[in-house]
């Protein structure tokens, strides 16, 4: 057999990033190249595989078994470095002469997959941790008095961050640029270039693996080996010099690559699921297309190719002839440039934000990728052209603070030059339907980017489009920016009193005008915010919001909390103490406040109502000084209603069942359920490695979970703690211990409690806990 050449693209690992800078949670990033590298002895890098076969090359021809035309297999490295772009004419000939192009997974489904995983993890807890670390646990360090009711105007630094901060996941999906090494990179990582080339050349582009299957296999790879006595490390293994991998790839030496993979693999289970099982799936995919009478160009991580269980041997075992294609490193730049110049035609259709505030025409849906620093980001990645469409939103609270859209537009104008990336090519200001800015820039790489910033009475909405070269300057960019619309019903109002009584929900209020913001109609909304404005802005702006603060260990005095909340609200606008009037909306403590702004002499009125962990704030700002008594007096707390009925929920981790409202219960995907079981197995085996006394394993059985109702702000916390037998000598000692726990070490008073034995193995205790000077 001739020399066997395969491209050395290290193990096709999916890296799970724990970076949560802008994701309100653990944003899991797709990355099919994972550097598990540092330093190791040089001689280890030259270790050979267990097979005597030689795998030399990157491009392989697949023929035989009745195929009319050969297919091709190419080993990639999932990075944009120039090293991997030494592509000869044989590469492009094979690519152009194929009916299909396949990658490990279909890039077109990445965004939807990541969104599904994000939603499941946020709802049910992170699957790979066994589902235990659910979000929104208790109060997430909320500053109830200092920040929760501080409806302030954005600081200039927030605007600066909004403009300078690149869309989360855009680089991960489209470029994989290293930042400092961008002068030594091409426009995208090699796999996506092949994906784009297939699209632009009219090929059918597919994934050899499903996203669910690939992700599950990669997660299974973290399960420790049964016979591994070393301390658990999911990404263990020894380390190697990263240059060893690059050198092996440059030499097209797949045997060396396979050996390097063996060195860095944490164990047999890691290698099985990260490589072996996935290799079988990839080979099956190639085989299925060949049986259809079609030929295909398949590109997978080079580490998947060599060895007895590599894709090459998998195909040979199925009866195919697989041989290396002579492949030089004389880069065919002409072919590459021709493909890069092609614009893949995309159909732009109208897309809406989750709350229908804005719409724009784009190639696909916008997915929320970040919600941090008060800035919400949504992204639509055009994988075929390497372009992205993004929308940023930042609440200004302008109707409450008195900062008009025109004023905020001027504030923004003063920082555009400093904070918008690149050299400004064109800059326009507009005033209709709202004030804003239209800016076109060119980055140091020569990429055109365009920004459209719109300032509505309540928020700043910024639209961005970016891409390689002058892509944004084409018709797609014009169509996107010309199609942007702000929904009039979401930014203006009519003078018609409106009764709002959400179902499910437990409030009722009569707003003097129709609301242009009403999150109570959105079942996915995590906050309650209702707002409307008189036709003449001077006549009044009205809003209702709810802050949830669940503190099960302490109950503050009602009067103290009401006073400090009202004073904190007022101190943003005046140095004088507000006028405070305590009230009682039986059994809920209330307080109204009023003051006049020192700056613009506007009048502020508010009412705070406390219902257990729920704090309601009704507010009004006007220039007439007329108190909105009718609005405040219309507010009621009503019994919760659940029109969709109830259903039973089972939690296998907590080992309990409970009845929950139907519309509150989102079903976890099958992938999530599988990942959760894998996570539990990982945790169990990891715990078993900590000492012989089993202490870690014992405490690791603790459970913490919660059930949340976004519509009402209610939360139920579930905690379980296993006790060894005879920890409590009798029932009285058990009750004394739980009394202490329920009363927060006797800091609060137990108003009533029950003690009930159910059968021989269960005792049920209930507690109602109170504290002095509080109705809660």
Task: Please give the residue ranges for each predicted region.
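Structured, acidic catalytic/metal-binding patches in enzyme active sites
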Residues: 58-266
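A conditional alpha-helix N-cap/helix-loop micro-motif detector
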Residues: 52, 84, 187, 275-279, ...
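N-terminal targeting sequences that direct proteins away from the cytosol to non-cytosolic compartments
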Residues: 68, 315-388, 395-435, 441-541, ...
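A cross-kingdom marker for long, charged
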Residues: 269-345
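Bacterial Sec-dependent N-terminal signal peptides
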Residues: 1, 7-52, 58-60, 484
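Solvent-exposed, polar/charged alpha-helical surfaces in well-ordered, non-transmembrane soluble domains
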Residues: 89, 93, 192, 196, ...
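Solvent-exposed loop/turn segments at secondary-structure junctions
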Residues: 78-80, 107-110, 213, 302-305, ...
């Amino acid at each position: 057999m001739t020399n066997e050449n395969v491209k050395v693209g290290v193990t096709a690992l999916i890296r799970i990033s724990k970076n949560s800078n802008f994701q309100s949670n653990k944003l899991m990033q797709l990355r099919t190249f994972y550097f598990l590298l540092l330093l190791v002895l040089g001689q280890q890098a030259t270790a050979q595989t267990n097979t005597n076969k030689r795998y030399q090359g990157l491009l392989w021809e697949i023929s035989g078994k009745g195929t009319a035309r050969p297919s091709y297999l190419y080993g990639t490295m999932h990075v944009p470095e120039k090293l991997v772009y030494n592509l000869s004419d044989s590469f492009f000939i094979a690519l152009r002469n194929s009916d299909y192009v396949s990658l490990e997974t279909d890039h077109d489904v990445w965004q939807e997959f990541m969104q599904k995983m994000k939603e499941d993890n946020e709802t049910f807890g992170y699957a790979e941790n066994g589902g235990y670390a659910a979000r929104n646990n208790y109060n997430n360090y909320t500053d109830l008095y200092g920040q929760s009711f501080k409806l302030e105007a954005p600081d200039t630094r927030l605007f600066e961050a909004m403009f300078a901060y690149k869309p989360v996941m855009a680089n991960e999906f489209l470029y994989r640029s290293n930042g400092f090494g961008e002068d030594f990179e091409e426009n995208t990582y090699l796999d996506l270039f092949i994906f784009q080339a297939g699209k632009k050349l009219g090929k059918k582009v597919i994934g050899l693996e499903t996203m669910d299957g690939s992700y599950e296999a990669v997660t299974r790879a973290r399960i420790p080996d049964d016979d591994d006595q070393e301390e658990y490390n999911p990404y263990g293994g020894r380390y190697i010099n990263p240059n060893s991998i690059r050198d092996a790839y440059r030499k097209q030496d797949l045997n060396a690559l396979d050996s390097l993979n063996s060195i860095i693999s944490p164990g047999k289970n890691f290698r099985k699921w990260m490589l072996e099982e996935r290799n079988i799936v990839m080979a099956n995919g190639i085989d299925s297309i060949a049986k259809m009478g079609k030929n295909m160009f398949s590109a997978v991580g080079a580490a998947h190719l060599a060895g007895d269980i590599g894709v090459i041997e998998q195909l040979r075992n199925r009866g195919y002839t697989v041989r290396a294609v002579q492949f030089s490193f004389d880069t065919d730049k002409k072919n590459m440039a021709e493909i890069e110049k092609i614009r893949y035609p995309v159909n732009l259709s109208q897309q809406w934000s989750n709350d229908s505030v804005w719409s724009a025409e784009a190639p696909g849906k916008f997915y929320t990728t970040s919600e941090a620093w008060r800035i919400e980001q949504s992204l639509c990645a055009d994988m075929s052209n390497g372009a992205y469409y993004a929308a940023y939103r930042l609440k200004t609270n302008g109707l409450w603070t008195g900062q008009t859209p025109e004023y905020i537009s001027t504030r923004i104008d003063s920082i555009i030059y400093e904070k918008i990336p690149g050299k400004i090519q064109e800059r326009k200001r507009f005033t209709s339907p709202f004030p804003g800015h239209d800016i076109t820039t060119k980055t140091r790489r020569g990429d055109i980017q365009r920004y459209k910033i719109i300032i509505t009475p309540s928020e700043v909405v910024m639209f961005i489009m970016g891409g390689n070269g002058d892509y944004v300057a084409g018709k797609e960019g014009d169509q996107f920016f010309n199609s942007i619309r702000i929904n009039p019903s979401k930014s203006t109002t009519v003078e018609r009193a409106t009764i709002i009584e959400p179902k499910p929900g437990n409030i009722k209020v009569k707003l003097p005008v129709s609301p242009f913001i009403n999150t109570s109609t959105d079942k996915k909304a995590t906050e309650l915010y209702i707002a409307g404005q008189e036709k003449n802005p001077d006549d009044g702006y009205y809003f209702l919001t709810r802050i949830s603060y669940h503190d099960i260990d302490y109950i503050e005095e009602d009067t103290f909390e009401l006073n400090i909340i009202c004073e904190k609200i007022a101190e943003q606008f005046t140095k004088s103490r507000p006028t405070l009037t305590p009230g009682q909306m039986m059994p809920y403590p209330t307080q109204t406040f009023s003051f006049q702004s020192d700056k613009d002499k506007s009048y502020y009125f508010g009412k705070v109502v406390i219902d257990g962990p729920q704090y309601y704030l009704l507010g009004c700002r006007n220039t007439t000084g007329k108190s909105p008594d009718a609005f405040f007096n219309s507010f009621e707390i009503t019994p919760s209603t659940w029109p969709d009925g109830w259903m039973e929920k089972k939690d296998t981790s907590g080992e309990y069942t409970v009845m929950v409202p139907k519309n509150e219960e989102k079903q976890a995907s099958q992938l999530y359920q599988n990942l959760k079981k894998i996570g539990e197995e990982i945790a169990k085996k990891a715990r078993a490695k900590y000492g012989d006394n089993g202490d870690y394993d014992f405490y690791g059985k603790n459970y913490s979970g919660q059930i949340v109702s976004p519509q009402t702000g209610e939360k139920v916390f579930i905690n379980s703690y296993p006790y060894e037998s005879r920890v409590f000598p009798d029932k009285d000692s058990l009750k004394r211990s739980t009394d202490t726990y329920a009363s927060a070490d006797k800091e609060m008073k137990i108003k009533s409690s029950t003690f009930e034995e159910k059968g021989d193995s269960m005792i049920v205790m209930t507690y109602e806990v109170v504290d002095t000077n509080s109705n809660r």
